[in-house]
Curated annotation (Swiss-Prot):
Function: Catalyzes the irreversible NADPH-dependent deamination of GMP to IMP. It functions in the conversion of nucleobase, nucleoside and nucleotide derivatives of G to A nucleotides, and in maintaining the intracellular balance of A and G nucleotides.
Gene Ontology molecular function: GMP reductase activity
Source organism of the structure: Streptococcus pneumoniae (strain P1031)
Protein name as catalogued: GMP reductase
Biological process per Gene Ontology, one example term: purine nucleotide metabolic process
InterPro entries for the chain: Aldolase_TIM (IPR013785), GMP_reductase (IPR050139), GuaC_type_2 (IPR005994), IMP_DH/GMP_Rdtase_CS (IPR015875), IMP_DH_GMPRt (IPR001093)
First and last residue of the signal peptide: none
HAMAP family: GMP_reduct_type2
Active site, renumbered: 176
Family affiliation: Belongs to the IMPDH/GMPR family. GuaC type 2 subfamily.
Domain of life of the native organism: Bacteria
UniProt GO cellular component terms: cytosol; GMP reductase complex
Keywords: NADP, Oxidoreductase
Length: 328
């Protein structure tokens, strides 16, 4: 029962160091395998319209990073798969659960993507289970990620239906207001929810939402994530698709949630909001910094690779990791 677990979030946790066994952090290996492919980092930019487009997806794939293309340009998905495969790159797309998506999946038989993510806000649903089974029947070699969920029961059901990985997180993201609009979600206890779900999982878990710092990547791995989906930290780059807006001489990029009025059109029910982020530099600079910070984390863990982070001790320090840092 959940009540037996301590409830905490990223800012409540500090990992405890072990003796370092490498001469330099550069020796630490940050790569991770998901399905039949190995990627440079255990992170994936959120499959949102303001985070990536086809060009960013291509840049990520060429660089050896995992990506998931969003599902908001439905007609462009088959040409996108062809574009990626023509270059010898992996194709990784998203689908919903509407009736027409069943026909779409059948159309993929001629050129199946390596990864499909079934992407709906409340993934513990009969509609998702049915779509997992359909994809597995039509495209048995495609790696299926299903979500989003927030309970061990959901993880087990989706895995049993055939999902190869589950995505955990209901509304913890910076531009997600599901928790406010509905009263439901993992906002404020996403890391504890990840731990709870990971204990039940037999297959990889992708932690989705609530990441505010690079240290949160290491914490996610400690509590059971194989891959971490990140939105706001990847938003606002020069390559990001969001509009660039100038305010008082400063450049900002817009960033909005996947069920916001900006993405859905003004009159649909919304569970996302729009914010402006100061424009950042190049995406590759952020990826490199993430890699270096994760290498440092692995060295603090006394390890050589990502999996070594799973075994470190931790303490719960209620909301105090910013103590003594006046800038937060």
């Amino acid at each position: 029962m959940l009540n037996e677990f301590p409830i905490f979030d990223y800012e409540d946790i500090q990992l405890i160091p072990n003796k370092c066994v490498i001469k330099s952090r550069a020796e630490a290996d940050t790569s991770v395998t998901l399905g039949n492919h190995t990627f440079k980092l255990p992170v994936v930019p959120a499959n949102m319209q303001t985070i990536l487009d086809e060009n960013v997806a291509e840049q990520l794939a060429k660089g050896g990073y995992f990506y998931i293309m969003h599902r908001f340009d439905e007609a462009g998905r088959i040409p996108f798969i062809k574009r990626m495969h023509d270059q010898g790159l992996i194709a990784s797309i998203s689908v919903g659960v509407k009736d027409y998506e069943y026909d779409f999946v059948r159309q993929l038989k001629a050129d199946a993507p390596e990864y499909i993510t079934i992407d709906i806000a409340h993934g513990h649903a009969d509609s998702v289970i049915s779509m997992i089974q359909h994809i597995k029947k039509e495209l048995p070699d495609t790696f299926v990620i299903a979500g989003n969920v927030g309970t061990p029961e959901a993880v087990r059901e989706l895995e049993n239906a055939g999902a190869d990985a589950t995505k955990v997180g209901i509304g913890p993201g910076k531009v997600c207001i599901t928790k406010v609009k509905t009263g439901f979600g993992t906002g404020g206890w996403q890391l504890a929810a990840l731990r709870w779900c990971a204990k039940a999982a037999r297959k990889p878990i992708i932690a989705d939402g609530g990441i505010r710092t690079h240290g949160d990547i290491a914490k996610s791995i400690r509590f059971g994530a194989s891959m971490i989906m990140i939105g706001s930290l990847f938003a606002g780059h020069i390559e990001s698709p969001g509009k660039t807006i100038e305010v008082d001489g400063e450049q900002f990029k817009e960033y909005y949630g996947s069920a916001s009025q900006y993405q859905k059109g003004a009159y649909k029910n919304v569970e996302g909001k729009r914010i402006l982020l100061p424009a950042k530099g190049h995406l590759q600079d952020t990826l490199t910094e993430m890699e270096q910070d994760l290498q440092s984390a692995i060295s603090y863990a006394g390890g050589r690779q990502v999996a070594d982070l799973k075994h470190v001790d931790y303490v719960i320090v209620k909301n105090s990791i910013w103590n003594g840092d006046a800038s937060h």
